[in-house]
């Protein structure tokens, strides 16, 4: 089982299973741990699936795994390896059995892994650590002495399981517990018999062993008892037994539960021990000690035997231990197969199914119980229990299990303590329930199967349903079983020592099972049970329970913050009593559980350590369990769990949380935020929650493994994943597992488990690489994210990984100064933790916390958030922290405690902290993310993500390396870089616009890392390396900074304390943390732990962090953006910037990887992830970030993802300092030697008569150097905009002066556009473009600052927009596409120091891409924000600053590229200074630029060049096809070439235009070619053959538009379009249809040539030039006959066509003034027609004559109407268009169904019913045809009239001899297959083809009459529509086939009548009919 993945890979091909092997932070097995971590990752992925099949067993297994992990970790290499060996030797029979059942063993592993996933993952991790804590000693003693048999079997089983993972998976897993394996396999049968015999009395035996004391004694003292317990366990493993036991516990009192738990405990103990042994072996194997694995399988066997619950044992062993110990062999193997299958942690069926064959006995009881359990488990409670159990245990193992845990194992009891917390978590099931409620589906038992999918194997679904159904005893039993099983597993692990807690846990599980489960108390549940049953560990257990309970209540009760608060508030209360109460209450009722939780929390305070642990466990359980349940479930569950935890905090942030989705609602946060919230909540809940977070972290690792197994795409689950990093070993295993699974699941995980991805990514990679390294990475994460949470666990993990022994020792020493203290403190919470633990799990924990800024940061953030969210909580937390002597440290400490007790550690990185470790654990997930481009196509700084296994390593390397490298690079001192990592990698989620989505898969998430300061530290370097590509620093960075800022501002004391702590913790935990944070330390100090914390608590911390980082420098909002900026600008170069960067990077990774591990690679993958990241941040940085979040959940994320770090919500935030702060924040920022140029432009436009007063103020380094005021007047164009541009010329990098600016513009332009929001946008862009380009291009000093602002002053005109558009255009394609990549470049290259214009307020999200470059780097995120801010023009200025980033990028990337192409850039530089002037003649800078401009007639955009600036915002364009015309700036897109991933319309050889996506560019002999992908096929098209439809062009308009973007509403809306048109206003570029060559064509030519061209129907097919063809008909652009201008001029050129009147094509260009008198005024209400899209057509003279002649035929009413119409002044299409545009109506040049559908209402305006193409198309499509009188009347009344009163008749019916009224019609040609035969291509074939297709025809075949050589299969057609030119051969054939042959009149009559009519009803229907 090479941990690296050779065997693991093969065995864990799916690697979805037991990554959850508890990873102890065993210094000894650091490398092993690392590998184990990877295994765990894999196992984690698999675990969810495995877990499903066996809930209760899972618990048992988990318990044991925890023990195992704990022992393995704690004793890991020293004691536990011995144990392993001993067990192996001691239990050779079992070993042989297992060996005999090698395949079975494997199966067990695989199958159980799913079980494990839920149980093992959650339970294993939690239980194992808990067990390790409780039973660490016991296990050592007991397992060595008692578990020889069971242990041997279990271990072996697991080992065997590895081999036969696919087959025996579930059964063996269950058997894995010691009995199950045997029960399942013949080899196990020996044990099985024992076990079975015990099984029968197992539960009862346990019950009989019920004396908690006895059980505990058994476990702790009585080896025989333990063996008995083990036997009981073996028997008990029968899931039914646990269920029963659980039930009994519930029904009975805690003692029975205890007793029962105790049996489980022994089982767990053995399993745990074996798991540990396995872990050790695995670690060794990871280290290369595969030999040990062989023996360990025996131990695994024993453990499995021990954990009678196959699930339990296998979970523990297979998942937790085996995977780790055996290199994930059995676990890994199991995870792959089982994981996928056993998605639901609680899904009993999976396990049972697999298990039933192998361990029928075991399964028999178990299935029933488990069946019900699965529901519980699926609900994440079980899963959470299991998961949390596991993570917690893992944490315990990692931290407490590592060194402290070793000691604890030696001590024995301490380990158990952690389990008790697990029990509480179980008890807190409600948390899971609550989260599950979020993902309600999780609850239903049915859900369980759903999680079956590897991705959904996160048990999230199960817990709530089952838990909530706990009322039924049977169900309760089952539910409880699942929950209890999970709990019990945990309990068993820890309950061996303390059965009472287990009982409690059961009790909780039972009644408050849903609460508990809901609460995600999986881990804690067992612990709680342990607590309940074992008051000895009451302190720790109680605390844990308390925490769990708080978590539970929080999570459960709508994520009740209050509960959390109360938990936090009640920390002082007796946790133990609480626990019992909790137990009973949980039993009794959910609410009670919550109360209990509160009480527990209260008690928690007393035993902070325990609480922390409990909370950790809770979180872990929560995370683990929830994360484990299933991707979706997991997301939900995780979301639930974390969210519930977060809920307290996130409740307030929930919007952000919810942004990701319902599940994602929490999921977004859940992965990161959830953890952040967990962190926060833990903070809020004081230590308990912190511990929980740590646990979560710890569990996260497991979960991560599990999650990746499940590939729970849900980032939320990832949160658990975050916990994954809980133990280095686990991480290693997880890492590896993730690696293996990464490819398959990474993307998925990333996308679905974005959090998980991060967790696994960040930690596993390093972990996989080196135990120490991952730990260091974790540490980094910790550091960078201030993931003290993670730090303790992750630090142990990371440090252990990196410096496995050294770090671990250091960490453990620092973390838990008393080696055992780590776990022990939890146990000894009351004693040791009482004061330190109050705040920090224990002094060590505190130290660890201190040592781990991440914990501190988390704490700080948490505190900040707490203080913001719940001051009371915070106070409680603070009080505890103060007890520790560090108020802020309290949270930090809590995290630290968690860290100290692994659980807390993992928990802390909820958002950021966990992320680093998670990254380690998650990399595979990220890899999966990459594999499945999901949301962030661009791996966030995780170039390795794509590689599954390597991705883990690499991701770890990259992410973690970013985290880790800086840390490593800096040498442990660089650990300080961890915070840097936080800063380093910023996952920014940009608004997802079509462009963004199209342009870069990862565009959504930008992993930004501060370009400037990022590299200052080693961490920075790492961050940059990671973020550089994507510059996602901003999201996390922003979050971190914001958080820091928040903390600094909102929670200075905590922040300061945190800082102090940070400073302190280097002292206390300084060894590790100092090493880790040395570099980071300063950063932290400088940033205030906030920075590191901020990643952890990104939500609050973003601002807080920013504040901390740039708190003094800028406001909170600014802080967020400034995180990067500050890093870059503020020159927080090394320290602050690094932390910021690290934070950012971590957060970005975190975003991707659930934010749990900021370091986790950028998990840009998912919006959810990003959202989660932000949410997580929100959670952590509730106040600041929350605001930010609220404003721009996605945006902020995006922005942050962009590396803008704009906490968009706060406004343009730091980048532009909100524009206002821009000066101060921008001005001071030029430390990079960039001259800070800032340009503030205020443009006021008066509608109608536009009088534009443009004031340009240029600042250089804050000094006003120039002020210009220009006044412009334009014809009615409605736009108003104010824009400020901060330009740092240097920032742009001086691409080419103007060019750079433009490039800047492109990014900035987009930003500006956005900022400007509509009309203003363009000007803004101009200013922003140039100015902003300049401003944003802080680096771009090229050109005068003013020059830089080559904002064409005429912002209305393209001039203004021009610069920005130009920039946009030149840089845009690159920018947009490279947004992410460019982002990194720009940010990295351009010293994002300059504030990025965040103001793109006006830009719609789609502009995101546009801002794309700008926003992408930082602006993208901002752009995202912009869209949100879009309406505010003020934001605009912010946008400018932000733009610089983009500009920077653009400059670097496309900017220079494009700009160089276009002269516009230089002009811009020149024009910049005279922006105002530029505005008037923006053309100056754009002349000669290659652009894509809109042909006014048909609305299509064609490539061409600007030949000169005509003024008034218009430019003369020479199109490539030879046409020339004046085009408004807004209709000019400065995007040549068209950006990649942009949807375009390409002219195929068949002369049909069809949509495609640009996938590449190439130049040959000066000619540009586009690689267009259509329907999966790519083809090269010439530049001229690629055009943009109106819709496609509008998407780019915001970003690349030369003129102000005027769409007020989303671009997709007709209203927006109309606004744009409005801007054009006078110019009337549409000049309607020039008279088309054919009347038909003319009337409809302008619209679309044919149906095929529908996308770009404007051009008639007739026009040969590809684009022209689209617009051939009536478009100005169409051929000369149409004469663009002439056509426009022609008022009503009449075409010859009978059906189509040329008028349609011709625009009546009457003098508006003259017309106004007749037509009515322009609407005073500028939004009169907003939302309406209009098609205008005009009756031809023939139509008028015909209608008049037929009036008599029609009803008098009709004639009267007709007369009325005649009385009305002549219809002037042009003037009517101007009226409609003036009222914000959108004019469709040609019929376009898509555009019509996007409008609120689409109307055809005509003077009368006519037979034009547009009219027919509207009849065919059901678009109402309205008289132009409606427009006239509406304008007169200045309010919309009811158009139904102005409906035009459909036409004259030949059959009825009258004019028929228009009526809504269904497709008249539904499913009709038509053959068109004619010699007129455009006016007949294409025209009628389009009309028929619009009318619903199934297919229309065009056949040219002259094409005699073509054979036509007439048999497939229903009708032939032709004209006299129809060849005789066709007629003959049709006649033979009895095919009706009709003329186009038949088609027309069908349209008029509204239904298909007879083919021979009228003579005119004959194709050869000759009109009279």
Swiss-Prot record:
Compositionally biased region (Low complexity): 1298-1307, 1316-1329, 1634-1650
GO molecular function: damaged DNA binding; histone binding; histone H4K20me2 reader activity; histone reader activity; methylated histone binding; p53 binding; RNA polymerase II-specific DNA-binding transcription factor binding; telomeric DNA binding
Subcellular location(s) of the protein: Nucleus; Chromosome; Chromosome, Centromere, Kinetochore
Modified residues (Omega-N-methylarginine): 1355
Source species: Homo sapiens
Effect of substituting residue 1624 to A: Does not affect recruitment to double strand breaks
InterPro entries: 53-BP1_Tudor, BRCT_dom, BRCT_dom_sf, BRCT_p53bp1-like_rpt1, BRCT_p53bp1-like_rpt2, Rib_uL2_dom2, TP53BP1-like
Designated name of the protein: TP53-binding protein 1
Cross-link (Glycyl lysine isopeptide (Lys-Gly) (interchain with G-Cter in ubiquitin)): 1685
Entry keyword rRNA-binding: no
């Amino acid at each position: 089982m090479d941990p690296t993945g050779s065997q693991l890979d093969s065995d864990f091909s799916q690697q979805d299973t037991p990554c959850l092997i508890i990873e102890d932070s065993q210094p000894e097995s650091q490398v092993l741990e690392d590998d184990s971590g990877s295994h765990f990752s894999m196992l984690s992925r698999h675990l969810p699936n495995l877990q499903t099949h066996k809930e209760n067993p899972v618990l048992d297994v988990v318990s044991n795994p925890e023990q195992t992990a704990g022992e393995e970790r704690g004793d890991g290499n020293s004691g536990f390896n011995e144990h392993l060996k001993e067990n192996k030797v001691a239990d050779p029979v079992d070993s042989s059995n297992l060996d005999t059942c090698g395949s079975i063993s494997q199966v067990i592993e695989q199958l159980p892994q799913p079980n494990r996933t839920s149980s093992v993952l959650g339970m294993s991790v939690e239980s194992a650590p808990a067990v390790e804590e409780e039973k660490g000693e016991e296990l050592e003693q007991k397992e060595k002495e008692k578990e020889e048999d069971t242990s041997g079997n279990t271990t072996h089983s697991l080992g065997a399981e590895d081999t036969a993972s696919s087959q025996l998976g579930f059964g063996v897993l269950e058997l894995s517990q010691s009995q199950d394996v045997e029960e399942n396999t013949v080899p196990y049968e020996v044990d099985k018999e024992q076990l079975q015999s015990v099984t029968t009395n197992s539960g009862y035996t346990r019950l009989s062993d019920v004396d908690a004391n006895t059980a505990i004694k058994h476990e702790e003292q009585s080896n025989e008892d333990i063996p008995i317990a083990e036997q009981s366990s073996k028997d008990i493993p029968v899931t039914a037994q646990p269920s029963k036991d659980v039930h009994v516990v519930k029904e009975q009192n805690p003692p029975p539960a205890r007793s029962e738990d105790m049996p489980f405990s022994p089982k767990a103990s053995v399993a745990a021990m074996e798991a540990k042994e396995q872990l050790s072996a695995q670690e060794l194997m990871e280290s290369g000690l595969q030999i040990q694995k062989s023996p360990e399988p025996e131990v695994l066997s024993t453990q499995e035997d021990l954990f009678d619950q196959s699930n339990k044992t296998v979970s523990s062993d297979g998942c937790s231990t085996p995977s780790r110990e055996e290199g994930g062999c059995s676990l890994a193997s199991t995870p792959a197969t089982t994981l996928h299958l056993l998605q639901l942690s609680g899904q009993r069926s999976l396990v049972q199914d697999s298990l039933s064959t192998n361990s029928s006995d075991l399964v028999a009881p178990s299935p029933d119980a488990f069946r019900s359990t699965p529901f519980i488990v699926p609900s994440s409670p079980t899963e959470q229990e299991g998961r949390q159990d596991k993570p917690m245990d893992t944490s315990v193992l990692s931290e407490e299990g590592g060194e402290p845990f070793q000691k604890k194992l030696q001590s024995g009891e301490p380990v158990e303590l952690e389990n008790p917390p697990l029990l509480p978590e179980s008890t807190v099931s409600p948390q899971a329930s609550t989260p599950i409620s979020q993902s309600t589906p999780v609850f239903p038992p049915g859900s369980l199967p759903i999680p079956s999918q590897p991705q959904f194997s996160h048990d999230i679904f199960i817990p709530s349903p089952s838990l909530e159904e706990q009322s039924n005893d049977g169900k309760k039993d089952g539910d409880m079983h699942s929950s209890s099983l999970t709990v019990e597993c945990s309990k068993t692990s820890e309950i061996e020592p303390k059965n009472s807690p287990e009982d409690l846990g059961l009790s909780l599980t039972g009644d408050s099972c849903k609460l508990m489960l809901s609460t995600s108390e999986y881990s804690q549940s067992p612990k709680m049970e342990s607590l309940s049953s074992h008051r000895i560990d009451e302190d720790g257990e109680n605390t844990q329970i308390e925490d769990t309970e708080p978590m539970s209540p929080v999570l459960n009760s709508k994520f009740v913050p209050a509960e959390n608060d109360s938990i936090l508030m009640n920390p002082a209360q007796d946790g133990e009593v609480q626990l019992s109460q909790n137990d009973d209450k949980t039993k009794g009722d959910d609410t009670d559980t919550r109360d209990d939780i509160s009480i527990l929390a209260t008690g928690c305070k007393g035993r902070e350590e325990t609480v922390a642990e409990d909370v950790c466990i809770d979180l872990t359980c929560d995370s683990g369990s929830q994360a484990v349940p299933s991707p979706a479930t997991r997301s939900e569950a995780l979301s639930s769990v974390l969210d519930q935890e977060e809920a307290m905090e996130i409740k307030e942030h929930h919007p952000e949380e919810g942004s990701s989705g319902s599940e994602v609602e929490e999921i977004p946060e859940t992965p990161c935020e959830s953890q952040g919230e967990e962190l926060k909540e833990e903070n809020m809940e004081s230590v308990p929650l912190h511990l929980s977070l740590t646990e979560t972290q710890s569990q996260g690792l497991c979960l991560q493994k599990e999650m990746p197994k499940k590939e729970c795409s849900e980032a939320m689950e990832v949160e658990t994943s975050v916990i994954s990093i809980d133990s280095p070993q686990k991480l290693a295993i997880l890492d590896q597992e993730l690696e293996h699974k990464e490819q398959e699941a990474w993307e998925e995980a990333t996308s679905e488990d974005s959090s998980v991805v991060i967790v696994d990514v960040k930690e596993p990679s390093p972990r996989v690489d080196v135990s120490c390294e991952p730990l260091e990475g974790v540490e980094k994460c910790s550091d960078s994210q201030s993931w003290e949470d993670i730090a303790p666990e992750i630090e142990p993990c990371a440090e252990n990984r990196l410096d496995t022994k050294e770090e671990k020792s250091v960490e453990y020493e620092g973390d838990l100064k008393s080696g055992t203290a780590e776990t022990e403190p939890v146990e000894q919470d009351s004693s040791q933790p009482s004061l330190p633990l109050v705040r920090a799990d224990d002094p060590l924990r505190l130290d660890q916390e201190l040592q781990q800024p991440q914990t501190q940061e988390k704490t700080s953030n948490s505190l900040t958030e707490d203080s913001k969210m719940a001051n009371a909580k915070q106070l409680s937390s603070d009080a505890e922290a103060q007890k520790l002597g560090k108020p802020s440290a309290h949270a930090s400490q809590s995290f630290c405690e968690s860290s100290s007790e692994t659980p807390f550690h993992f928990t802390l990185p909820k958002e950021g902290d966990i992320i680093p470790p998670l990254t380690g654990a998650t990399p595979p997930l990220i890899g999966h993310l990459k594999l499945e481009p999901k949301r962030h196509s661009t791996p966030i700084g995780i170039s390795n993500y794509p590689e599954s296994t390597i991705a883990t390593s690499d991701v770890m390397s990259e992410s973690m390396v970013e985290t880790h490298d800086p840390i490593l690079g800096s040498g442990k001192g660089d650990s300080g870089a961890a915070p840097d990592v936080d800063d380093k990698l910023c996952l920014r989620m940009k608004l997802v616009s079509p462009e963004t989505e199209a342009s870069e898969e990862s565009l959504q998430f930008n992993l930004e890392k501060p370009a400037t300061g990022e590299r200052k530290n080693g961490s920075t370097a790492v961050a940059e390396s990671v973020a550089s590509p994507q510059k996602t620093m901003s999201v996390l960075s922003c979050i971190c900074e914001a958080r820091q800022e928040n903390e600094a501002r909102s929670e200075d004391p905590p922040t300061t304390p945190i800082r102090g702590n940070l400073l302190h913790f280097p002292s206390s935990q300084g060894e590790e943390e100092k090493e880790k944070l040395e570099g980071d330390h300063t950063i932290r100090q400088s940033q205030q732990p906030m920075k590191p914390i901020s990643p952890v608590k990104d939500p609050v911390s973003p601002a807080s962090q920013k504040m901390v980082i740039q708190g003094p420098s800028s406001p909170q909002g600014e802080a967020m953006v400034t995180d990067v900026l500050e890093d870059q600008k503020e020159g927080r170069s090394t320290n602050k910037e690094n932390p910021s960067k690290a934070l950012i990077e971590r957060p970005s990774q975190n975003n991707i990887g659930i934010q749990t591990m900021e370091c986790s690679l950028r998990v840009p993958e998912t919006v959810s992830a990003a959202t989660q990241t932000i949410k997580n941040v929100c959670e952590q940085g509730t106040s600041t970030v929350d605001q930010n979040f609220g404003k721009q959940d996605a945006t902020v994320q995006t922005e942050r993802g962009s590396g803008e770090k704009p906490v968009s919500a706060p406004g343009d935030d730091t980048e532009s300092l909100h524009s206002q702060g821009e000066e101060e924040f921008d001005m001071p920022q030029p430390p990079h030697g960039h001259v800070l140029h800032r340009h503030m432009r205020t443009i006021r436009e008066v509608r109608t008569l536009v009088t534009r007063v443009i004031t340009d103020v240029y600042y250089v380094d804050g000094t006003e150097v120039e002020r210009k005021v220009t006044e412009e007047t334009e014809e009615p164009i409605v736009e108003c905009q104010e824009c400020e541009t901060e330009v740092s010329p240097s920032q742009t990098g001086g691409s080419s002066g103007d060019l750079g600016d433009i490039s800047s513009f492109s990014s900035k332009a987009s930003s500006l556009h956005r900022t400007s929001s509509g009309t203003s946008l363009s000007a803004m862009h101009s200013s922003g473009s140039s100015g902003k380009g300049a401003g944003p291009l802080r680096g771009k000093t090229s050109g005068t600052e003013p020059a830089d602002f080559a904002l064409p002053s005429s912002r209305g005109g393209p001039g203004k927009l021009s610069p920005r558009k130009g920039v946009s255009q030149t840089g845009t394609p690159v920018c947009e596409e490279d947004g992410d990549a460019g982002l990194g470049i720009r940010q990295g290259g351009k010293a994002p120091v300059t504030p990025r214009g965040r103001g793109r307020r006006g830009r719609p999200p789609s502009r995101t891409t546009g801002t794309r470059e700008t926003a992408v780097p930082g602006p993208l995120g901002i752009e995202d924000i912009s869209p949100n801010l879009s309406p505010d023009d003020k934001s605009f200025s912010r946008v400018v600053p932000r733009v610089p980033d983009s500009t920077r990028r653009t400059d670097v990337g496309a900017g220079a590229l494009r700009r160089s192409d276009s002269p516009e850039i230089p002009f811009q530089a020149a024009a910049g200074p005279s922006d105002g002037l530029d505005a008037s003649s923006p053309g100056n800078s754009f002349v000669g630029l290659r652009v894509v401009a809109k042909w006014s007639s048909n609305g299509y955009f064609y490539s061409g060049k600007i030949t000169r600036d005509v003024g008034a915002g218009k430019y003369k364009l020479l199109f490539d096809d030879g046409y020339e015309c004046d085009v408004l700036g807004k209709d000019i897109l400065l995007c040549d070439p068209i950006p990649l991933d942009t949807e375009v319309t390409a002219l195929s050889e068949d002369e049909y235009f069809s949509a495609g996506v640009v996938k590449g560019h190439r130049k040959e002999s000066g000619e540009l070619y586009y690689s267009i992908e259509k329907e999966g096929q790519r083809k090269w098209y010439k530049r001229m053959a690629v055009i943009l439809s109106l819709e496609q062009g509008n998407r780019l308009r915001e970003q690349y538009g030369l003129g102000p973007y005027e769409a007020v509403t989303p671009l997709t809306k007709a209203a927006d379009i109309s606004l744009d048109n409005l801007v054009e206003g006078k110019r009337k570029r549409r000049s309607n249809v020039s008279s088309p060559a054919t009347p038909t064509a003319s009337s409809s030519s302008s619209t679309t040539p044919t149906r095929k061209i529908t996308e770009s129907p404007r051009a008639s097919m007739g026009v040969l030039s590809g684009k022209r063809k689209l617009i051939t008909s009536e478009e100005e652009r169409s051929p000369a006959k149409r004469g663009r201008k002439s056509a426009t001029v022609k008022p009503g050129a009449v075409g010859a066509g009978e059906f189509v009147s040329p008028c349609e094509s011709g625009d009546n260009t009457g003098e508006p003034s003259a017309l106004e008198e007749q037509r009515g005024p322009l609407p005073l209400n500028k939004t009169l027609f907003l939302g309406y899209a209009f098609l205008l057509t005009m009756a031809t003279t023939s139509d008028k004559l015909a209608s008049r002649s037929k009036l008599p035929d029609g009803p008098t009413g009709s004639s009267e109407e007709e007369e009325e119409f005649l009385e009305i002044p002549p219809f002037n299409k042009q003037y009517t268009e101007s009226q409609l545009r003036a009222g914000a109506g959108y004019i469709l040049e040609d019929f376009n169904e898509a555009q019509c559908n996007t409008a609120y209402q689409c109307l055809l305006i005509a003077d009368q019913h006519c037979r034009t193409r547009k009219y027919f198309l509207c009849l065919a499509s059901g678009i109402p045809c309205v008289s132009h009188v409606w427009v006239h009347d509406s304008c007169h009344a200045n309010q919309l009239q009811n158009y139904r009163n102005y409906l035009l008749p459909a036409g004259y019916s030949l059959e009825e001899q009258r004019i028929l009224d228009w009526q809504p019609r269904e497709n008249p040609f539904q499913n009709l297959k038509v053959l068109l035969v004619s010699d007129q291509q455009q006016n007949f074939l294409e025209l009628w083809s389009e009309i028929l297709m619009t009318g619903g025809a199934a297919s229309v075949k065009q056949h040219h009459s002259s094409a005699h050589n073509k054979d036509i299969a007439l048999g497939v057609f229903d009708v032939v529509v032709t004209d006299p030119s129809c060849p005789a051969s066709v007629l003959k054939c049709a006649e033979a086939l009895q095919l009706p042959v009709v003329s186009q009149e038949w088609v027309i009559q069908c349209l008029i009548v509204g239904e298909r009519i007879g083919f021979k009803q009228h003579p005119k229907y004959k194709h050869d009919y000759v009109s009279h």
